[in-house]
Amino acid sequence: PGMYIGSTGERGLHHLVYEIVDNAIDEALAGYCDHIEVKILKDNIIQVTDNGRGIPVDIQADTGLPAVTVVYTILHAGGKFGGENSGYKVAGGLHGVGASVVNACSEWLTVNVRRDGKEYEQTFRRGDPDGDLKCIGTVAEGVTGTRVTFKPDPEMFKDTTVYDFDTLEKRLREESFLNAGVKITLTDERQLYTPVLEDGQEGDPCYRSEVMCYEGGIKSFVTYLGEKRKLEVLHPNVIYLKGQTDRGVAEIALQYNSSYNELLLSFANNVNTPDGGTHEEGFKASLTRVFNDYGRSHGLLKDKDENLSGADVREGLICVISVKLQEAEFEGQTKAKLGNTEIRTLVSNMVYSKLMEFFEENPGV
């Protein structure tokens, strides 16, 4: 399992949730889902519900099994292979293995599908079907979606099977920033807690819950990161750049503040790439070039002055880079670094032309 989810420790345990959420996010990216609900139930059981189309239940010719059964039992069966015709142009789930790996890492898993006016259910134990897919009732016309409920296997996750609310919240908040307008709700139903109200009084006991939805997308993300760190911004509006080719889409939001630190977060198909990669390289090279070229052409840098370095121009910068690609190439199974060479060119060209244009139009910045 470590090959697919990174570890069988705490990180891998939480990765199971992200894999199922990524499937729902793929429905959102395709335009079919706008609400994803994640619950931590008693005994650290996880439930993820989306209002997407619902995983198909029709029998597949090559296996003789319902599509949903195949998705949860066969590696690489997800609809994520082959761009245009796979059902998804871009997808964040781990190489299409997500659902079946989560199933294999669970003591039990139940999937409920609502589509075509009916609700279907199937349960699995340690990855194998525990009975066939059944129709368990009807739903109102137009009601669709998928609900996955699973209990991580304690024989596999020997360190811990206890979920941490804050860890899940951080990741799900990232997902909501990266997918503008998608609402993600996280609720902890393991125990009640007593909230402290604004006037200092205690409120009624309730489950801890966070609702995350950002119409501003990654611009809101940059604002959030600055406010969280109580930073003094040097220009009021976040700069937003977007570029697109037939290979993918790149979005960048950036803002400078009075600190000396650089904070750069990058994502490819909604997956954080902490080790950077070609999207970061393209951005950094172009940002430095823009500052030097603009500085020289406007007399801010004199002939005798040395060029500004990359470290100089990224001082006090908060930046979020998000690229969405049909075929993302990650280095290492845990996707820490992006390898697509064509994205370096896309990001580099976009940053240079659009940022140069921005500075010409906003010399005050």
Label every model-predicted segment.
Residues 1, 41-42, 139-149, 254-268:
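Flexible hinge/switch segments at interdomain interfaces of large molecular machines
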Residues 1-18, 70, 84:
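Bergerat-fold GHKL ATPase/HATPase_c domain
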Residues 3-8, 24-37, 78-91, 111-113, ...:
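Active-site phosphate-binding and catalytic loops of NTP-dependent enzymes
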Residues 7-10, 58-63, 279, 310:
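Conserved, non-catalytic sequence blocks in retroelement Pol enzymes and Pol-derived host proteins
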Residues 10-35, 98-105:
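Conserved ATP-binding N-box helix of the HATPase_c
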Residues 44-67, 78-215:
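GHKL-type ATPase core
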Residues 132, 166, 174, 181, ...:
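GHKL/Histidine-kinase-like ATPase module
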Residues 310-365:
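Extended, well-ordered alpha-helical scaffold/bundle regions in very large, multi-domain proteins
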